[in-house]
Amino acid sequence: MVDWEKVNSVWSAVESDLTAIGQNILLRLFEQYPESQNHFPKFKNKSLGELKDTADIKAQADTVLSALGNIVKKKGSHSQPVKALAATHITTHKIPPHYFTKITTIAVDVLSEMYPSEMNAQVQAAFSGAFKIICSDIEKEYKAANFQG
């Protein structure tokens, strides 16, 4: 059982620095999985150094973390925002579902580095559990849509 309260207690701190945290997460994603950059047309063929402080990466960071925050705040009752997120990523962005697992795993790592006192082992486990459920629910939407990407 996921402790959504623990997740949301840290998420409130995340919201005060959404852009910087999102930038760190996206840049780490691109560093660890360079092929992921190809799914972002504005970021294709650019070095991490070129992307670091651009308006485009900041805007994408806000978009990604705002969407994730909207889901997290639902405390498990997230079917509508998950369906909406999956729909755009299936039809418009065509991003394979395994990238959700990759980015949420990176998010736990980045949050643990940025908030070491708040992100103790129990809170990390709560985040990992929450993200696992969210990613599983997103994957169900992909399967229902018969995604071939």
From Swiss-Prot:
It catalyses: Fe(III)-heme b-[protein] + nitric oxide + H2O = Fe(II)-heme b-[protein] + nitrite + 2 H(+); H2O2 + AH2 = A + 2 H2O. The keyword Lipoprotein does not apply. Gene3D superfamilies: 6.10.140.2100, 6.10.140.2110. Heme b binds at residue 89. The modification N-acetylvaline is found at residue 2. The keyword Zinc does not apply. It comes from the Eukaryota. Its EC number is 1.7.-.-, 1.11.1.-. SUPFAM superfamilies: Globin-like (SSF46458). It is found in: Cytoplasm, Sarcoplasm. It is an enzyme of class 1 (oxidoreductase). Pfam families: Globin. GO terms for molecular function: heme binding; metal ion binding; nitrite reductase activity; oxygen binding; oxygen carrier activity; peroxidase activity. GO terms for biological process: removal of superoxide radicals. Residues 2-143 form the Globin domain. Monomeric. Belongs to the globin family. PANTHER family: MYOGLOBIN. Monomeric heme protein which primary function is to store oxygen and facilitate its diffusion within muscle tissues. Reversibly binds oxygen through a pentacoordinated heme iron and enables its timely and efficient release as needed during periods of heightened demand. Depending on the oxidative conditions of tissues and cells, and in addition to its ability to bind oxygen, it also has a nitrite reductase activity whereby it regulates the production of bioactive nitric oxide. This is Myoglobin.
